[in-house]
């Protein structure tokens, strides 16, 4: 469709704004200044607010949040609480909250759900890591920023306001702050994102963009656009930039973190830097319109030329301060990440949090900051307490996770040297892909890799090339920032597409009913489709119900597009239009109800024991057992498991009602928060809420008991770490728990009988045996070492000269450990050892002067693998044949 948007609004006519074209960038803009020739934005105009605040008073960040919110509240907008910075809490396509409109996507923006208020105002903290390497260096970039926004959602039934009022509000707010109207320009522009599009204004003053006013009204379809029924006012005001411009500080960081910056400078012993230098750097950065770190070296050169200083001296002077700026920004970002419950890991949002944390720790090391990162983040939490008290409520978790992650980082760095040395041994260059692999797989920052390689180059026989891109962290963050949908292999894909009405689910209204009658709408292959059913279809982690239709077994139940498919053992017994009688296997259903209710109970208990940060990442409810996967930053201890189990059973004994209600999505979110999505994102404007009174509330479509007492005894059977940052709890309920306890008891009794001791003596006896075994193992290892030394002399005369190396190929009696001990004694210098035992075990080991890879050698003479200096496997040929093959390889 052809789009001809008129950017003229009522305010422009009333105040006699003029439309002009920028002489520098050719963009069209509106201004009150009849003499203006440029659009006002950088790089067409330089920052003119540094050292010269543009508002009638100076605003702190907290004051600016309040001023912005109060202004729009006075204009009839309902203030809405911020959402978490973890967008995964309510949507599954992005990990972090990157804009205020993300809070209302996809349900509100696509018209499925009404907005919680209309119009509304929100000050939404956002995180974007696509500029993380620019932070601290340009004077304006932040990883964590607050997008002030007023949104209006206009439909044919409910119209609020559009372009005229939006521009009027913006201009009035800026004048209320004391900004001269003649300095404000409205640049005509176009916005696209998330499949939507619309015209917009970029609102500029004194060289800096303070707001963007978007009018979302189109859907992008290929290269064309379609008008959408919901017209959305989507504005974004940079709260931090408003505060910066009101204070006129050299960089945005002083306006936000002045107290923290001063403490860090004092701690690191960094001398004062002339504010004019930092102001010049920030101003020139604006003129250069820096969007990639490659331009930063050019920026440094330009600043040096402008102030008449050598570029290396300038770099030495301001780099430490730039690190401090970055630390201040990153610790605020981490305060939101951890305060909103992110658990560090090697995937998804946990990966991004760990990236920011380790980058911060590296910078702290680099400039010698002695205070802990916990101290810095404690200051951040205190500073934000007035606006975001909920972050301080999570302080205990934040401090605990920082402790755990700092220890992991130190361990990573300590083992990093060996990892890098092994990689460098077989390479002439450490590439960007190598650096990313070392970071992703081993957590090694590129700076540490470079330090190790530089040391190797100084004392090594060869030179290994390495270049660390200035934007390394941006590159790795962008690879992980977007959520990629996981491929799920499901039986639902095999189900046919049908044009019948959705199946009425009777178990919501009649949770204890076991029999029903229904009409057959369709016979689809091996499935029967009914107009209504009591059978629960597999979903939400819960297994399907089983039972009968007209005495014919129902062995599987699936759902697709709201239609329930019943798999029966004899499809020939059914025909469309017939009425059938359905009967559930009630014992099976009861077990599923108990185990599903137990999932909620254990989740609530785990939250009390481990903390509010835990988040359900998956569950599986079967008849015999259930399992729950939750985020947590360390292994769950035995004592914590016992406490979780105790609290869970206390809830069972307390006979707590389990209530099921259907609620409007907005009402549920406002009442309970985003924790209702613990079980996963639920579509639609109406949610089924399961509430265990004052304990656990979740949006859930499964079958549950009506009271916790019906669950029976809960036994946590085991926990395991299924991936970094995720713990799995496996449990049983009722008679299942009795059976599991009996198995454990039998194991203990059998073990005690084998040892011929009473049950209560088992732990002490096992401990004694274990200590004795360790002593014997130590003695055996010492004997093996002595045997190896003796065999060394026996084999010393059996080496043969092959090419440049002394080669030993020998069959030796002994275990793999004994052969390893022998090889350790012999593999020195230019010696190459190949040992075999009578069990087909094969060992290849080389001395430090042998360049041939043992991993490659073993593949040529047998089967196996290993490293360049040591390989193990199996052999099938004779000693003579293996010797001949080695000679051929070495004499090539």
From Swiss-Prot:
CDD domains assigned to the protein according to its UniProt record, in alphabetical order: AlaRS_core
Keyword RNA-binding in record: yes
Xref: InterPro entries: aa-tRNA-synth_II/BPL/LPL, Ala-tRNA-lgiase_IIc, Ala-tRNA-ligase_IIc_anticod-bd, Ala-tRNA-synth_IIc_core, Ala-tRNA-synth_IIc_N, Ala-tRNA_lgiase_arc, Ala-tRNA_ligase, Thr/Ala-tRNA-synth_IIc_edit
Catalysis performed (reactions): tRNA(Ala) + L-alanine + ATP = L-alanyl-tRNA(Ala) + AMP + diphosphate
Cofactor note: Binds 1 zinc ion per subunit.
Domain of life: Archaea
Keywords: Aminoacyl-tRNA synthetase, ATP-binding, Cytoplasm, Ligase, Metal-binding, Nucleotide-binding, Protein biosynthesis, RNA-binding, tRNA-binding, Zinc
Subcellular location: Cytoplasm
A Gene Ontology BP annotation from the UniProt entry: alanyl-tRNA aminoacylation
Disulfide-bond pairs as recorded: none
GO MF annotations, alphabetized: alanine-tRNA ligase activity; aminoacyl-tRNA deacylase activity; ATP binding; tRNA binding; zinc ion binding
Binding residue positions for Zn(2+): 596, 600, 700, 704
GO CC terms of this entry: cytoplasm
Matches recorded under Gene3D superfamilies: 2.40.30.130, 3.10.310.40, 3.30.54.20, 6.10.250.550, Bira Bifunctional Protein, Domain 2, Threonyl-trna Synthetase, Chain A, domain 2
Enzyme Commission number, as recorded: 6.1.1.7
Listed cofactors: Zn(2+)
SUPFAM superfamilies: Class II aaRS and biotin synthetases, Putative anticodon-binding domain of alanyl-tRNA synthetase (AlaRS), ThrRS/AlaRS common domain, Translation proteins
HAMAP family cross-referenced by the UniProt entry: Ala_tRNA_synth_A (MF_00036_A)
Function: Catalyzes the attachment of alanine to tRNA(Ala) in a two-step reaction: alanine is first activated by ATP to form Ala-AMP and then transferred to the acceptor end of tRNA(Ala). Also edits incorrectly charged Ser-tRNA(Ala) and Gly-tRNA(Ala) via its editing domain.
Domains: entry comment: Consists of three domains; the N-terminal catalytic domain, the editing domain and the C-terminal C-Ala domain. The editing domain removes incorrectly charged amino acids, while the C-Ala domain, along with tRNA(Ala), serves as a bridge to cooperatively bring together the editing and aminoacylation centers thus stimulating deacylation of misacylated tRNAs.
Recorded family membership: Belongs to the class-II aminoacyl-tRNA synthetase family.
Name assigned to this protein: Alanine--tRNA ligase
Species: Methanococcus maripaludis (strain C6 / ATCC BAA-1332)
Lineage of the species this protein comes from: Archaea, Methanobacteriati, Methanobacteriota, Methanomada group, Methanococci
Gene: alaS
């Amino acid at each position: 469709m052809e789009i001809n948007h008129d950017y003229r609004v009522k305010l422009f006519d009333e105040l006699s704004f003029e439309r002009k074209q920028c002489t520098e960038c050719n963009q069209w803009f509106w201004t009150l200044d009849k003499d203006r020739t440029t659009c006002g934005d950088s790089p067409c105009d330089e920052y003119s607010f540094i050292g010269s605040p543009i508002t009638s008073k100076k605003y702190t960040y907290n004051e600016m949040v309040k001023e912005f919110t109060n202004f729009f509240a006075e204009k009839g907008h309902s203030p809405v609480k911020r959402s978490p910075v973890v967008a995964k809490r309510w949507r599954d396509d992005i990990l972090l909250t990157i804009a205020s409109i993300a809070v209302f996507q996809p349900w509100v923006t696509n018209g499925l759900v009404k907005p919680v208020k209309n119009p509304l105002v929100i000050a939404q903290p956002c995180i974007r890591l696509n500029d993380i390497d620019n932070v601290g260096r340009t004077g304006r970039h932040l990883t964590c920023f607050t997008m002030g926004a007023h949104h209006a959602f206009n439909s044919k039934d409910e119209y609020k306001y559009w372009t005229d009022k939006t521009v009027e509000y913006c201009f009035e707010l800026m004048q209320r702050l004391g900004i001269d109207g003649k300095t404000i320009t409205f640049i005509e522009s176009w916005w696209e994102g998330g499949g939507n599009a619309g015209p917009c204004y970029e609102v500029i003053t004194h060289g800096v963009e303070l707001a963007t006013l978007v009018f979302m009204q189109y859907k992008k379809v290929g290269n064309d656009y379609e008008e959408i029924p919901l017209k959305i006012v989507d504005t974004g005001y940079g709260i931090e930039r408003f505060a910066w411009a009101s204070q006129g500080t050299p960089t945005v960081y002083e306006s936000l973190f002045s107290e923290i910056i001063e403490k860090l400078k004092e701690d690191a012993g960094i001398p004062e830097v002339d504010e004019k230098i930092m102001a010049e750097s920030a101003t020139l950065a604006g003129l250069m319109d820096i969007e990639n770190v490659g331009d930063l070296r050019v920026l440094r050169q330009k600043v040096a030329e402008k102030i008449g200083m050598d570029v290396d001296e300038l770099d030495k002077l301001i780099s430490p301060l730039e690190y401090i700026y970055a630390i201040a920004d990153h610790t605020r970002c981490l305060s939101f990440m951890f305060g909103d419950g992110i658990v560090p890991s090697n995937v998804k949002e946990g990966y991004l949090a760990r990236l920011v944390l380790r980058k911060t720790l590296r910078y702290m090391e680099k400039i010698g900051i002695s205070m802990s990162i916990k101290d810095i983040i404690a200051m951040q939490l205190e500073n934000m307490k007035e606006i975001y008290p909920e972050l301080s409520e999570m302080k205990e978790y934040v401090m605990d996770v920082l402790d755990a992650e700092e220890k992991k980082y130190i361990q990573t760095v300590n083992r990093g040297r060996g990892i890098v040395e092994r990689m460098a041994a077989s390479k002439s260059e450490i590439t960007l892909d190598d650096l990313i692999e070392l970071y992703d797989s081993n957590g090694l920052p590129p700076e540490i890799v470079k330090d190790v390689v530089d040391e190797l180059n100084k004392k090594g026989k060869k030179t290994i090339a390495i270049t660390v891109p200035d934007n390394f962290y941006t590159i790795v963050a962008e690879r992980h920032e977007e959520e990629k949908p996981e491929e799920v292999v499901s039986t639902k894909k095999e189900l046919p597409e049908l044009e019948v009405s959705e199946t009425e689910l009777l178990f919501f209204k009649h949770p204890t009913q076991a029999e029903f009658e229904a009409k057959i709408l369709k016979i689809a292959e091996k499935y029967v489709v009914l107009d209504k059913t009591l059978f629960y279809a597999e979903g939400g982690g819960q297994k399907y119900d089983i039972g009968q239709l007209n005495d014919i077994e129902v062995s599987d139940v699936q759902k697709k597009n709201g239609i329930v498919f019943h798999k029966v053992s004899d499809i020939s017994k059914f025909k469309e239009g017939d009425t059938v009688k359905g009967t559930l296997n009630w014992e099976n259903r009861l077990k599923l109800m108990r185990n599903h209710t137990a999932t909620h109970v254990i989740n609530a208990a785990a939250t009390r024991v481990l903390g509010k940060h835990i988040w359900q990442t998956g569950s599986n409810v079967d008849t015999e057992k259930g399992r729950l996967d939750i985020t947590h930053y360390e292994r769950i201890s035995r004592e914590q498991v016992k406490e979780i189990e105790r609290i869970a059973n206390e809830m069972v004994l307390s006979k707590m009602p389990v209530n099921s209600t259907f609620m409007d999505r907005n009402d549920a979110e406002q009442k309970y928060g985003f924790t209702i999505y613990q079980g996963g994102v639920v579509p639609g404007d109406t949610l089924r809420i399961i509430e265990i009174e004052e304990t656990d509330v979740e949006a859930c479509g499964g079958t549950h008991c009506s009271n916790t007492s019906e669950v029976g005894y809960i036994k946590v059977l085991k926990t395991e770490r299924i991936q970094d940052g995720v713990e799995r709890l496996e449990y049983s309920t009722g008679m299942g728990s009795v059976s599991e306890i009996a198995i454990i008891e039998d194991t203990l009794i059998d073990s005690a009988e084998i040892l011929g001791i009473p049950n209560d003596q088992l732990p002490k006896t096992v401990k004694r045996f274990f200590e004795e075994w360790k002593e014997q193992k130590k003695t055996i290892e010492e004997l093996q070492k002595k045997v190896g030394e003796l065999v060394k002399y026996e084999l010393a005369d059996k080496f043969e000269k092959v090419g440049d190396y002394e080669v030993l190929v020998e069959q030796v009696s002994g275990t793999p450990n004994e052969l390893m001990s022998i090889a350790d004694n012999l593999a020195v210098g230019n010696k190459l050892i190949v040992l075999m035992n009578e069990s087909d075990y094969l060992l290849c080991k080389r001395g430090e002067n042998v360049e041939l890879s043992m991993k490659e050698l073993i593949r040529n003479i047998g089967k196996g693998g290993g490293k360049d200096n040591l390989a193990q496997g199996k052999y099938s040929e004779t000693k003579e044949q293996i010797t001949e093959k080695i000679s051929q390889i070495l004499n090539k």
